[in-house]
Design a protein with these regions (language model features):
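Conserved alpha-helical substructure of the radical SAM core
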Residues: 1-99, 103-106, 204, 208
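Flexible loop residues that form catalytic
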Residues: 62, 90, 112, 181, ...
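Conserved residues at the C-terminal ends of beta-strands
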Residues: 29, 60, 110, 179, ...
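Alpha-helix N-cap/loop-to-helix initiation residues
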Residues: 66-67, 93, 154-158, 282
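Radical SAM enzyme [4Fe-4S]-AdoMet core and its adjacent flexible, acidic
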Residues: 14, 32, 37, 80, ...
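Flexible mid-to-C-terminal extensions adjoining Fe-S/redox cofactors in radical SAM and related proteins
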Residues: 1-6, 29, 247-258, 265-323
Length: 323
């Protein structure tokens, strides 16, 4: 792969720095700044977005729906035939149901398990009920509107993936995907990687890994071929193997991924990363998007990156293999 990027089909924008949940596996909620990507700032980069042939923008977080003018941003992008997806906690879906249905292409909500487990992990009383009400409000407006779920596996929900899939189906969601919790990187607003005691609060013991493996095998047995669970058997096995690697029982193995060559992550303060987990390659506060993704630092990074042997890639829980 060349180190020079001529097209960037996927752009992940974090329009707002804060979040309205307090999840045990994430530190974004600790952010106190009001940083957000303004419409004026986005306007400055629209020409580069078009030149890079961006096809899909994903609004990630923090919680995108906390942005003061999110639907203006989405309108600017959709006017250029760019698909816009929101990753959301689900707490604000009901409030913005009409705007979502008319101005966002699809939504992916966080779903951590059945109601009591979801609320415990989110540390927001009634979070599941608000998610359920939001999904219903959107589907009342458009029964075919696509809302998928993503479940992050960790110590508080490792024993209930099968039940989580059933909950997602009962909610009327379109699909569900699973990933392992990241416990080693400085992503998700960690000022430094977690110490061992903090990792142990989220990662699994060996007995828990075996329980998780059986659960994921049940998910594959019950839902294989349905199209409802995004991961196949191999990808589900990678989740339990990720926790085995954390225990030192197997070698951590990087997934197939081309994220640094086909995507970029722009944080609310303008910081640009090649993916969620690798260090920044520049900032939109001082350069244009095109200057950053094809700047010296970015090209040096991509030119030297061997995904298969890179230790950060080996720990990755959220890869992208764009075709």
């Amino acid at each position: 792969m060349t180190s020079l990027i001529r097209s960037l089909p996927v752009l992940i924008l974090c329009p707002h720095a804060r979040c309205n949940c307090r999840c045990v596996m994430c530190d974004i909620w600790k952010e106190t700044s009001q940083s957000e990507l303004t419409a004026e700032e986005l306007t400055q980069h629209l020409a580069d977005i078009e030149e890079l042939s961006v096809k899909w923008v994903v609004f990630s977080g923090g919680e995108p729906l906390m942005h003061s003018d999110l639907f203006r941003l989405s309108g600017m992008l959709r006017a250029r035939d760019i698909r816009v997806t929101i990753l959301s906690t689900g707490l604000l879906l009901k409030r913005y149901a009409h705007q979502i249905v008319t101005r966002i292409d699809d939504v992916i909500v966080s779903l951590d398990g059945p109601a009591h487990i979801h609320d415990q992990i989110r540390r927001v009383p009634g979070a599941f009920a608000q998610l359920e009400q939001g999904v219903r409000a959107i589907h009342d407006l458009n029964p075919d509107y696509r809302i998928a779920a993503r479940c992050t596996i960790q110590r508080m929900n490792y024993a209930c993936p099968s039940e989580t899939v059933r909950v997602a189906r009962r909610l009327g969601l379109s699909a569900i995907s699973f990933l392992a919790a990241d416990v080693t990187s400085d992503a998700f607003n960690r000022f430094q990687p977690w110490e061992a005691y903090r990792q142990a609060q989220v990662a699994l013991t060996l007995d828990e890994v075996w329980t998780l493996q059986r659960e994921l095998e049940n998910v594959d047995r019950d839902w294989d071929g349905s199209g409802f669970v995004a991961e196949n058997a191999e990808k589900l096995r990678r989740i339990s193997d990720h926790f085995r690697a954390h225990l030192g029982l197997v070698r951590a193995q990087a997934p197939r991924c081309n994220a640094p060559w086909v995507s970029a992550v722009v944080e609310a303060n303008g910081t640009v990363r090649p993916c969620f987990f690798h260090p920044p390659i520049g900032s939109l506060k001082s350069h244009t998007l095109l200057q950053v993704v094809n700047g010296f630092e970015a090209q040096q990074f991509r030119g030297a990156l061997d995904v298969a042997s890179n230790p950060v890639c080996a720990q990755c829980v959220c890869s992208l293999n764009w075709r």
